């Protein structure tokens, strides 16, 4: 007599077992990544020189240092004033993107 319960075929059972293992691995990896580092490991971490920034590097990339050093922005120079306003607006846009919206 055959049992009344259904048994899945071996390939289906193997696929389900593999899927279950992958899901468990994924969740265990996410949980371990979300945990803070132990105190002993955190003490060994040191920021590299120049790793922290205050926004000046963005201004340097946009050419602000060269303009100010060369004295290109003179009274009545509309092109320079316009470039400076666009640069400042762009920096404001970059730094306000990370703030929470009401």
Swiss-Prot record:
The modification Sulfotyrosine is found at residues 93, 95. Promotes plant cell differentiation, organogenesis and somatic embryogenesis as well as cell proliferation. The keyword Signal applies. InterPro entries: Phytosulfokine. The gene is PSK5. Its main location: secreted. Belongs to the phytosulfokine family. Keywords: Developmental protein, Differentiation, Growth factor, Secreted, Signal, Sulfation. GO terms for cellular component: extracellular region. GO terms for molecular function: growth factor activity. GO terms for biological process: cell differentiation; cell population proliferation. It is found in: Secreted. Sulfation is important for activity and for the binding to a putative membrane receptor. PSK-alpha is produced by endopeptidase digestion. PSK-beta is produced from PSK-alpha by exopeptidase digestion. It holds the Pfam family PSK. It comes from the Eukaryota. Residues 34-92, 98-102 form a propeptide. Residues 1-33 form the signal peptide. This is Phytosulfokines 5.
């Amino acid at each position: 007599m055959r049992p009344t319960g259904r048994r899945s075929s071996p390939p289906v059972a193997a696929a389900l077992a593999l899927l279950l293992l992958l899901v468990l691995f994924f969740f265990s990896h996410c949980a371990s990544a979300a945990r803070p580092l132990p105190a002993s490991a955190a003490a060994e971490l040191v920021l590299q020189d120049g790793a922290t920034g205050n926004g000046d590097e963005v201004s340097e990339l946009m050419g602000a240092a060269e303009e100010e050093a060369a004295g290109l922005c003179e009274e009545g120079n509309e092109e320079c004033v316009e470039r400076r306003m666009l640069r400042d607006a762009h920096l404001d846009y970059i730094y306000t993107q990370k703030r929470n919206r009401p």
